[in-house]
Amino acid sequence: AMACCAWTMPAVAANAAPAAPAPADGPPLVLPNFAALARRNGPAVVNISVTREVAQVGIELPPGIAPDSPLAPYFARRVIGNREEVSLGSGFIVDADGIILTNRHVVGDAATVDVKLTDKRQFKGRVIGSDPLSDVAVIRIDAHGLPAVATGDPARTEVGDWVMAIGSPYGFANTVTQGIVSAKSRSLPGEAYIPFIQTDVPINPGNSGGPLFDLQGRVIAINSTIYSKTGGYQGLSFAIPIDIALDVKDQLLRNGRVTRGRLGVALQELDATLARSFGLASADGAIVTMVAPNGPGARAGLAPGDVVLSVNGRGVADSADLLDTVARIRPGRQAELAVWRAGRALRVTVEVGALDR
């Protein structure tokens, strides 16, 4: 229901002095200059057009028999063919000699990859490699002296920080959008090993693979996915931290594949209530709920009910943080875990295994 609200100015004595302005709590708010950021970083963002061969099934009829003819079901013949499907995405140059990062789902199963720069030059792209777990792919184009982005440290980004995205939503190249970091270390269904950065930056189909910048113009993440009931932007956007993407890039360029470490345990989040029941002062950490037989954790002596507090001296915030930290350790190397068990602190040394995925 609508309500009409009228505000009446209170009577003031004719000679009354004007009220003094309330003191400011701090310096005036200055909004960031997104125009300068976009101007400086736009040339390193690319538009990616991908062609795929998609199988399709059709029905073929002999000449003279219409599809609605009663004879059609008896003479129809199933035929299988291919059709071309074109999709669009974004990417960004990380090396002046033609190395580009994007999402795997942008270039997966591509027959051809066409890359267009902001100066309207176009190149054929070659997919060097991709990683299903992180959804990161590396493309190379035959060009040199290209504008490349600078990269930052996602760990230094805080909730509430301004961020900016550049990409090609629905093919509209070099579209600039902005917002803030809404949350960090988000774990999405089926993506437990990636601690996503959540933002409210408007992201739509075609933005995938584009960069997320901080206010210093450094890329801190790759825009990857949205949560939506409509298929379009609804305020929930998720990006892959750039340090994870760069590690994937380096491994793909060096080895052609990506390896990750694993503990061989199932984990549960630790909340304030559980932390108190365990006798812990903080809810930081991850609870071990299951240990795979003969896995790295089992061989090291980890047990259900253990709370992992740190890895190699680095504190664990939650289960996604623990999985990410261990994934970055090369298989075969040792890691020292700080573990809380039955009210006392332990040190557990584990030889990190290899993640099969």
Model regions: which residues?
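C-terminal segment of classical bacterial N-terminal signal peptides
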Residues: 2-12
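Serine-dependent protease modules
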Residues: 14-284, 289-296, 300, 319-323, ...
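Conserved catalytic motifs of ABC-family nucleotide-binding domains
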Residues: 305
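Short strand-turn-strand beta-turns centered on an Asx-Gly dipeptide
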Residues: 311-316
